[in-house]
């Protein structure tokens, strides 16, 4: 039988070195992190033959006390921690005391260091773990270490090294990441005496990015930032022009430590794909600052992996920060013209100053001046006919659907409807939309023609005279239009709405646009717990596979808040009794199964909010489809609803809903200009 052996120090050190020092870039990482922990502001790295022949690090840090120079190369000797309690509040990059002895056991090391308090420094030479000399030396404050002939006594490890070019590239990439994490430190990297990198150390992250990735990259970045009590997130994400087929240009730092974390990478990518469906991976430089006791960096030999005490919280924080920045970036490309935006703001201020009662009173006074004209064969209603001033061309409108008024004002609306009935208008639709023009509000609210045909509204997939998103007069007033009011000029291929504004042609994907309107409406209703439900005439019993039932059972509360009334029916069966009102025409069985499948793909670690969004995305199935013929009025109302949602520019799957071509761009296409 095999007996238990006690390994000698040399063998033990080489085994430890195999965990810490995998390749030349591992040596660079450990030594540069030591320099940073020493407070260095200028760090120079020199390598030869991919680091195999020479790795040299020079810094201007605090240095090592002369009495500690030899001690620093003993296993588990460190200045970073003292006891077990310190492990749970680590503020330094290194702390185990393994790097220097591990490196010294597999290479020839020349170590020099000097502190501010001493006139002379100390030089220690170690080869293969054996001390050769310890002498005084003359040098400036800081540390200089040379590592030569790496793996000279471990041929098994040496033969697994990549080519010189590959090892050099890995070192270059590592120094780039460390430079990003420390913009206040100047880094210089030399490869075979050729300068590869030189950062300024001025504390500006964008300058480091420009130095490493180039001017073009720096000009296509979007800054994001989010702060909570226990953590902060900030950094840059590239727009779609910087997306690539690999994740090579993704950098994640936690307390300035470069780490890899699959969950947080997915959080950034999911936020990015909400606005881009390129199928590629985004460029990003992400920083997370949090309390040391809320993370564990001691789970991997190279400290390249990290665990969070509350990973769901961090996931949501990262997702929200990136998503919000991307949304604002996209919105900025469709900004309202300055003149129209000023008029909108002026209108909003005026509405704020006037009470709602006063506004309704003003409407009552105007009823006497309203002329109605109804065609019996078309059953059309013309409300508030007027001739606008010729001097006023560019108008900003705030649309106030009557059926979304408060209870008090609904009573006024009811009186208004009765007066219409008394005038023999029996076929007038109860669903009205009154459009207010800012100039006309100031001039006793002169009125604009609004037409609708009751029959066409009832039969259309898109209820064009009912605002899909707004819920009240106040909500309608305070929402901000995200792009100008467009003039519809037609429909192309029964799929795209053509519209124009200010010498610009807009193309709107009718399905994607309606998808996003429904998605935001449903998401808002879920958040406010105001989902309108529709009972099924005949409840459906669905038998699920065991795995699917377990996922349903785990997320019961989420389905309930999303507007589904489902009860257990025994033996992995469920009974579907009620569904959200606008999903009642869809197949409930397929709907529930699809939602469960979506939740399965997400796993159990996702936040409740993300799961709600995934369920809300199913509302897209109720949207108008491609090849659906829409009237001009239906298209106008769809666009009007789109203008006021939070993000009108992308559907829930990330596809664009609206694109534009300026007159200049079209002229160039037709070669009218060069």
UniProtKB/Swiss-Prot annotation:
SUPFAM superfamilies reported for this sequence: ATPase domain of HSP90 chaperone/DNA topoisomerase II/histidine kinase, DNA mismatch repair protein MutL, Ribosomal protein S5 domain 2-like
Keyword Cell inner membrane: no
Disulfide-linked positions: none
UniProtKB keywords: DNA damage, DNA repair
One of the record's GO cellular component terms: mismatch repair complex
GO BP: any one term: mismatch repair
PANTHER family: DNA MISMATCH REPAIR PROTEIN MLH, PMS, MUTL, DNA MISMATCH REPAIR PROTEIN MLH1
NCBIfam families: mutl (TIGR00585)
Family of this protein: Belongs to the DNA mismatch repair MutL/HexB family.
Protein name: DNA mismatch repair protein MutL
Source organism (scientific name): Clostridium perfringens (strain SM101 / Type A)
